[in-house]
Each structure stands twice: as C-alpha cells, then as structure tokens.
Amino acid sequence: DNTLQDILIRFKRMSGYNVVWIPGTDHAGIATQVKVEEQLAKEEGKTRYDIGREEFLKRVWAWKEKYGNRIEQQVRRLGSSCDWSRKRFTMDDICARAVREVFVALYEKGLIYQGHRITNWCPHCHTALSDIEVDHKDEAGHLWYVKYPVIGEDDYIMIATTRPETIMGDTAVAVNPNDERMKKYIGKKVLVPLVNREVEVIADDYVDIEFGTGAVKITPAHDPNDFEMGERHNLESIMIMNLDGTMNAAAGKEYDGMTLKECRKAVIADLEKLGLLDHVEELNHAVGHCSRCKTTVEPLSTKQWFVKMKPLAEEALAAVDRGDTKFIPGRFTKIYDHWLENIQDWCISRQLWWGHQIPVWYCDDCGEVSASRTDLTECPHCHSKHIHQDPDVLDTWFSSALWPFSTMGWPDKTPDLQHFFPTSVLVTGYDIIFFWVARMMFATCEFMKKVPFKDVFIHGLVRDSQGRKMSKSLGNGIDPLEVSDMYGADALRFTLVTGNTPGNDMRFYMERVEANRNFANKIWNASKFVIMNLEDYDPEFVPTTDDFTLADRWILTSFNQVVHQVTKGLDSYELGDAAATVYDFTWNSFCDWYIELAKQRLYKSDDKRSRQTAQYVLVRVLTGALALLHPFMPFVTEHLWQHLPHEGESLIVAPWPTVDEALDFAEDAATMNIMMEAVKAIRNMRAEANVPMGKKAPVTLVPSDEAMAEVLHTYETYFKTLAFVDEVHILKTTDAKPENAVVTVVPRIEVYLLLKDLIDIEKETARVAKEQEKTRGEIERLEKKLSNKGFTDKAPEAVVAKEKEKLAAYREKAEALNKRMEDLKHL
C-alpha cells in the first residue's frame, strides 16, 4: 500500500506537481487495548479495572510510544517520501478537535442518537465490534429440529435452529408467506418450549423456504436478522444473556448463570425429556470470532450510539454517480454503491477505554444529556455539578473517516486545506472500501461539501505463495524490515509493484525478491561500467544526427517509446505494467544490447567523436532510465544518479523524462530490430546445434534489398560482437548460396550458418537420434495415458490439463528434432 502510494508521489513530484503526502496512523482502538491488557495480565497479573482508567491510559500511551513507531520504521525503511513534519495520529490534538466538532455537529442535526440495536459483542473484550473486527470461520455444528406445539390443536410446527440455547428469548415463529406448507399456521399461536410463552406465527419474505423446515424461531435480542424482523412486526425483545456471555434470569432460573455451552447442553437434554426434540442434523456454518481475542462473538441487543447513515449516504452515492470520484478499477463502483444503497445505521460506540471518549455528559440531577465541543464541568440545563461523561469511546473508524480534512487542521480554514484539499488519489485495499472509503466520502461531503479525493485506486491483498492470506496463526507473514535487510528495500518494492494489477490479490514469492535484487545489481554494474568510461567525458559535447550509429538511433528511439509507455502506465494506475516496461528496457535493450555494442567504440575506436557520441548516448539513456526507475527503486537509482553527470541536487526532484521528437528515428529503429532478429537467429542455430561457446562460426547473410545490404556492410561488426561470429559474408540474392549450412530467415535477411567444421556430425547425429527415441517414448506414454477414460474421467481437471500440456511440448520437441536431423543430413 505504502509502496504504491510512494510510486505515485515520486512520479508526480518529478512531473512538476506540488505534492504532499501526510504520514500517520490511527490509534487502533481495540487492537491496542487488547495488547496492553495482555501485557498487564502477564507482567502484573492485573486487569485494567484493577488499576483504573487514568492509569491504564498512561500505560497505553507508553506502549504506543514504545511499539507504535514500528509501522513508521517500516514505511521509512521502504523509502516512502512522506512529509514527516506533518505526521498525524488520530488521537493527537488536531485530529481530536475535528472528531469532537463532527460528533457534536451530527448530534445537533439529529444524525447521532442513542438506542438499542443488535451489534457484534465480544464477551471477553466486553465491547461492541465492527464487522471488520470479526473473523468468520467455518465450523462443524448441528441443526436441531424442535417442535413448537400449536395452542388449541393437536399439532405442532417444526422449526430448525443452530442455537437452541436462545429458545428462551423467542418472541415469534416466522414462515415465508409463499410457502404453501406453512400457510395454515400463519396467525396461529404456538408455545415456546421450556418457557411456555405464547407467540404468534408470522409471515415474512425474509424466511428461506429451503432452510430446514421452512419455519424459523425469532429471537430479536440475539440475532441481527431476527432484530430487523422484530422491528417490522413490533415484536418484544427479550435479552437472555449477560454481557460476559453467561445466561441471565430471563432465560429461566434453571439456566441462570450457565455458560452458553452449558446452557446448550442443558436445553437439548430438557427438550429430549419433553419429547420436543425431533432430530438433529450435522451442519457446517460460519461462526464469528473476535479478531483480537478469538472469543466467539455474540449478536446482542445493547444500548449504543449510532449515526443515521441514509441521509449521509445520499450525497456520497451521488458524488460517485456524477463522476466527482471514480474507482480504479471501475468494477469496485458497484461494490461501493451496493453497500451505500443498503446501508444500516452505524454503531460508533465501543466499550473500551483507549480512544476518543464520547463527548456526551449526563446530569445526575435533571437527567439531561448534553453533547459538547469542550469538556463540561456543569450541566448546561440546570447548572448542577453532578455530571459524568459517557465512559464509552468512538469506533476507530470514526476518526479515520475524517482523515482527509482533519489532518490539515479543520475546522480551521488553514492554508493546507486551501492548497491541498481535496486530495488527488486515495490508494487502499478492496477490503476496507466500506469501512474507510465510504465513510471518508460521506463525512467529507457532509462537512467540506466536496469529495475527499478524485480517484480511489484499489489494490488487492498480498498473499503467500500458496494464495493464503498472511496471518500469525499460519506463520506465513513477512517482515518488510527483514526482507529489506536481506535483499534491499528496492528489491522488495519492485516485487510488490510488478506483482500488482489494480484490484487483484498478488502472491508473494521470495524468489521474485531475489530476482529483483539481481535486477538492482544489473543496474549497478551497468552504471559502474558507464561511469568508468567517462574519464574524458565532455558535458558540453552534443552530437549531430549524423554522428549517431544505427544502435544509437535505435536505443534513443526505444527510450522515447519507454518514456511514453511508463508515463501512460503511471497516469492510468497500471503501475505493474509500467514497472515491467522499464525493467525490460533497462535489462534487455540497454544492458544486454546497447552497452555491448557501445563497447566497440569505447574500447577500440580511435575516433574521438565516435567515443564522445557513445558517451553522450550512454549518459542520456542511463540517467533517463534511472529517472524512470526512481519511483520504483529510489535508493539505488538516487545513489547511481549522483555519480553520473547530472543537473540539479537530487534525482527525487529531477524532471521526469519526456519524449524528445528530435531523437526519434523510427525507420532506423525498425532496421536495428531486424538486425537483432538476425543475431538471435544465429544464437538459436548455434544452441540447437550444440556449438561450444568458445567456437566462432562464419555466417553468410543474404539481404533482400540494397538498403539492407548497405546496413549489413556498415554494421557487420554487430554480428561479430553479439553472435560469436568470426567472418561475415554478405551476398546478393543472385549469388550462389552456401552449401553444408543451416539456414533461417528473418525479415529482409536470409541467414546461413556454416557448422561443418564446428561440430562432430556423426556424434551429433547419434545424440539427436537418441533424443528422438526418448521423445517418441514420452509421446506414446502420454497418448496412452490420455486415451484412458479411467484417467481423464477421474483425475482433477488441472492434472489432465497438465498432461496435455506435456504432450504438446513433446510433440513440438519432436518436430524440432526432426528438423535438426534433416539439417545434419545436409552438412
């Protein structure tokens, strides 16, 4: 995430923009509090209640100072070019002031209220949780089928439930109005087992006809869907659990004080005794767990603070619909729209001590509730001194939602807000579009009357090499600092971006980090070569067009193309493609081709002007390539750039490369590409013939036209340098062609390689024959395997596909061996 942001920041800074990237962190309410509570229990054997709120918060701040800087260390180590003088923390004074202003303003508009709703409740942490703080895991469970007697009839309605321990809180049974089997029960009264409560059978479209029997028990106080149904049908809500997860008196005296597991066991036994348990089925279902303490989460109806979301969501939806903010990739717009169109009120209170304490005071004398931007010492209504502040804190996401403007000093009208707001782009993961992106949108639209950002660039998650989410439990996480120490921050950054496509997850392979470390070494070595050959470099020398060789013109034209492609890729957030483009150019075009050709003029040429021209092109292209690479690999590029001829103090603020039309030679570049094809053809023929590396071969080239003939005569040394050739013969199309040679054709050139004196033909023929026999055997084996219905029908599709790929590869190899054998016969 930080790497992608930094790439964009560096690119825009070099492109001449006045950029600002404000670093910072949120206070991670429950995560931080749980860590400190664990430390307190481990070191002192105490709970937070033992030491009190004030002392506990001192411990949290101390822990934050000690451990909270690790994220900053990682961000700095990876080279993020933030403005560290602007660092923000959601609990600092500037952000805290904005939090209070927003809370009170929404409260005064009637958009914040207190009420009872179902929330995710952690019985261990004793707090409500946001959905993102709940991990859902598939667990083996059961579906119990229970009979609810119909009052006044010798009949019963059968319900199916995964939670028999909540039966005592039932206030209705529900069926789908379109279920023909159940229509006869609608409106009738049934008895809730164990508590003998009379409840009505109601009709609601929410009920799934296919689930269980088609009839479900409704427990409004202990299930979010039941709560919504209870609201629609005005049902009573009976809380049968305590906040610590034990049963209370409302569950019945025989269950009062039991844990949930104990209660479930007792309820099942009692139902069996009464003959009301019909049967049990095994069932796998998702169970929510607190992401911090791993305790099973309970849906409980508790008194909390809420934000009315529908009025706020309207403008956040409209802004995206108008195009004021756009998602990249665009498919995430649908996800954003779906969440906001179906939004529920947001529970913003948490029963924690670490966080922004809710700015609401209760009067113990007159009972009034007052929200205030400043701390109150007396009741604004009756002036009583007997007041107390709400002990709960705000959801961490509440302060994070204000980040685009709170960090710039709002509610004051600061120069930063005037100059840098709204921001250009938000870079974030798809997993927090609702939790963070949508909330920043509605908060900013409400208080700034503008969108917070123009673009939302969505990236995926980094997974391990097997595609699993990284987690402590799996032990598959990576420490960016450790990887950076092993391979360098540049290699890690380049790995994270080249494996990234917008909106998609990426698999992390340490081998790719190592490969990108090798790329950094390649850049280093190429730069060192150039630097060592600049002792007589003249920065005032500017070659004319006539001074450029074919290779010069090709590399300058290629560089123009790469500048265009990389700039376009970064502008369109195709960061992975942009990185791959500059990688290919730097490694292949510049290092493997151009530098090798430039060596002739640097080492052997007595022509000073030719040497100066080579130096000019090397410096121009290398410094340009380092500039293109800089957003991706800032450390190595900055270091090398400083040792090359340059203007300005630092690469980080150097101008971004632009296309130079005066140095664009498309026709010459196309000709050079043909020359390169011919070189690669010679290399391939040598490899196929097993010509030893040390042996040079004579080559004959037959150009198809006079223009190409002139090029070949002028640059025949390219073949000697790059293709292990000692003699180059250039023939006309009317000349007799060489005998005893292998031939291949590239555009505008026939290439003949004389092999007779370079290989032992008899020995090579025997080797190829043996390889042919082995290949035929593999083809027969695979054909037999794939014709076996037992294999193709039973084996996984991926395995069958893999075997088909092998067969295709062996058939291709057989064709190549047959051609090789024919070539040997003619030598």
Where are the predicted features?
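Residue patterns forming the tRNA-binding/recognition surfaces of aminoacyl-tRNA synthetases
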Residues: E37-Y156, I167, F211-D365, W436, ...
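Conserved phosphate/anionic-ligand binding catalytic regions in large, soluble enzymes, centered on
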Residues: G24, I157-V175, R292, E298, ...
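Conserved oxyanion/phosphate-binding beta-strand-loop segments in alpha/beta enzyme cores
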Residues: E37-A41, V60-Q74, D179-Y206, N234-L235, ...
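Feature 926 captures the class I aminoacyl-tRNA synthetase adenylation module centered on the KMSKS loop
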Residues: Y145, H338-F398, L402, E446-A489, ...
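Extended active-site and interfacial segments that coordinate phosphate-rich ligands
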Residues: N2-T3, I157-P193, V216-D223, H233-M239, ...
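N-terminal catalytic cores of NTP/NDP-binding nucleotidyl/phosphoryl-transfer enzymes
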Residues: D1-V36, V99, A160-T161, T166, ...
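Short acidic, glycine-rich loop/turn motifs
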Residues: Y148-D154, P177, L191-N196, C363-D365, ...
